Amino acid sequence: MAKRIETKDLDIYYGSFHAVESVNLIVEPRTVTAFIGPSGCGKSTVLRTLNRMHEVIPGAYCTGKVELDGVDLYGKGVDPVAVRRNVGMVFQRANPFPAMSIRDNVVAGLKLNGVRDNKLLDEACEKSLRGANLWDEVKDRLERSGASLSGGQQQRLCIARAIAVEPEVLLMDEPCSALDPISTLAIEDLVSELKERFTVVIVTHNMQQAARVSDQTAFFNLKAQGEPGRLVEIDTTERIFSNPKEKATEDYISGRFG
C-alpha cells in the first residue's frame, strides 16, 4: 500500500560537512514528486535519506525526522534493511546483477527475504515484469543474463526488481539520464502507471520530464558555494512551472541559471 512521506527539519551531514539544511516536505500517497535543482544542491542526498541509503557512506548522518505514515524511519530500533524493503530505490545507471538470469534478477529480493517456493517466485516475476512493462519483451528468454538486455530494458528490469518486494514508496535517482529518447519515454510512461500502486519520488535534471510525469515539484538550490543545499519551494507541478513563488525557481526553470 502506498504511503505518505513527511520530512521535518531534516538536516543532512557528511562528517563535519553540512550538506542540506532544514528540509520540510510532504509527499502524498499515489503521487509523483519530482526533485529538481542544479548539480550539488542536495536533491539526490535528500532522496537517499528517505530510505536511509545515505548511511552506507561513512560519516553520513542526519537530524530531524523522516516519517512514513507517521512512523519515524530513524526511530530507535528501526531496522535500515526493513526501511529499504518498504522504500525501494532505482539508481541513475541500470545495475542488473550480471551473473544472474532475468528471472533471478527480478526475484533476488524475494529470495533474500526467505521466499523459496518456485511457483510463488514465478508468479512474482511475471507480475513485476508486467508492472515494469517488460514482460512481453523478455518472457521467452527469462533464463538469459540480465546484462543481455538493452540499456532501457535493463533499467526497467531494475524497476521490476524494486517493485517485486512490494514496497510502499519507490525512489528514482535520475533513472533516464543514461538512456536514449525512446527508452526515456518508456520509463516516463511507466512512472505514470507506477503511481497507481506506489508513492513515487524522482530526481531529474530534465525540466520537461518533471513537468510531464510529476504531480508535485520540489526545487532545491544552494545559498552559495560551500553552503548547505536547501528546499526553496515545493508546490503542484502546474504552479511551479507556471507561477512559482520564488524568483530563484523561475530563473532555474527558465534556464537563466543552473
Swiss-Prot record:
Its EC number is 7.3.2.1. Residues 5-247 form the ABC transporter domain. ATP binds at residues 37-44. SMART domains: AAA (SM00382). GO terms for molecular function: ATP binding; ATP hydrolysis activity; ATPase-coupled phosphate ion transmembrane transporter activity. It is a peripheral membrane protein. GO terms for biological process: phosphate ion transmembrane transport. One of its GO terms (cellular component) is plasma membrane. It catalyses: phosphate(out) + ATP + H2O = ADP + 2 phosphate(in) + H(+). Gene3D superfamilies: P-loop containing nucleotide triphosphate hydrolases. Part of the ABC transporter complex PstSACB involved in phosphate import. Responsible for energy coupling to the transport system. The complex is composed of two ATP-binding proteins (PstB), two transmembrane proteins (PstC and PstA) and a solute-binding protein (PstS). This is Phosphate import ATP-binding protein PstB.
